[in-house]
From Swiss-Prot:
Gene that encodes it: Tfap2a
Organism: Rattus norvegicus
Spans annotated as Disordered: 14-107, 414-437
Any one Gene Ontology BP term: oculomotor nerve formation
Region (H-S-H (helix-span-helix), dimerization): 280-410
Note: The antidepressants, citalopram, imipramin and lithium-chloride decrease the DNA-binding activity.
Protein name in the entry: Transcription factor AP-2-alpha
Amino acid sequence: MLWKLTDNIKYEDCEDRHDGTSNGTARLPQLGTVGQSPYTSAPPLSHTPNADFQPPYFPPPYQPIYPQSQDPYSHVNDPYSLNPLHAQPQPQHPGWPGQRQSQESGLLHTHRGLPHQLSGLDPRRDYRRHEDLLHGPHGLGSGLGDLPIHSLPHAIEDVPHVEDPGINIPDQTVIKKGPVSLSKSNSNAVSAIPINKDNLFGGVVNPNEVFCSVPGRLSLLSSTSKYKVTVAEVQRRLSSPECLNASLLGGVLRRAKSKNGGRSLREKLDKIGLNLPAGRRKAANVTLLTSLVEGEAVHLARDFGYVCETEFPAKAVAEFLNRQHSDPNEQVARKNMLLATKQICKEFTDLLAQDRSPLGNSRPNPILEPGIQSCLTHFNLISHGFGSPAVCAAVTALQNYLTEALKAMDKMYLSNNPNSHTDNSAKSSDKEEKHRK
């Protein structure tokens, strides 16, 4: 007791010297108060929070804990407030520096709960969790270090489900539904991710896949039909012999003109593995057939063939032309010419019937020799499937004319030689009688 009194006297002497007063009268009231209640003013074990308080055991890299009096969220109920459950540190509920306790609970448990509070708010435990994730036994250091920053929370959430061979990236990330195996080396962490090139980076796409649908140009407004354009057809339009550029291809596909229309079309073609360089020049002359897609061109050829078959006036043309050659001396020679022409037309149509040019989704096996087949293919690529059927329809109309011309020639021959018919009938009757005998 005397030792404490002497200490207080020394403190008072220091204060008097600092204030410039050396009389002892000022110390007497304080000595009485110290003797009565020596621990009422400021006990040495109490840690009242103030602005100069800094925990001495924090390492330099981490920020010190801010005083509780400066907490703007002190009125909010803190789920990590001090209670008997926090007597031991809880590793599964680490406290962050922004989550502070209220001033009232801190004052009530200042002497007893401050060490546990500091251990719960220690940011080293939070950083240690990230270090375990990046350098844990699963070898995730290289993988998570190379992943994008927005995918890091998803990877952290999936760590409890991670197996040693690899992890599965969730659907919310950029890489969709692809197993990702992260290696242990930083150099090949990204290269070890298998990615579906058909969906992300382009590549070989099914040629029969529909690229887009194009409305017809030749149909009426009351019966507008759309034609499906496949990837193979787009590839044919970009290849020889047409070699369309972005502007012409956009017109064929009926794409609206825009400022970046060519760029968007090239990007869409890159996704299906087709390259359309900028500034490309067309290789063939532009015709009305250039604006047609294959479906509409074939439809046009079929309708043209139907009209030629049903509406072409073959009989009237044959009768008109035969009247110009009514001389009996020319009829035999003309008939032979008609028969020879009909045979030539038949050979020509038979050749076109064996054409196996690629059209639409068909990939027929070639029948003709490569030399003649390549020429027919070139013609069909220029006309987009309209050429060969249209030529066959025209030649069929010519054959119908030849047939009607031969019939008219026979009628003219019989009308000019009426006795020949009776002579032929008599000869045939004589042969039948001999055969009966």
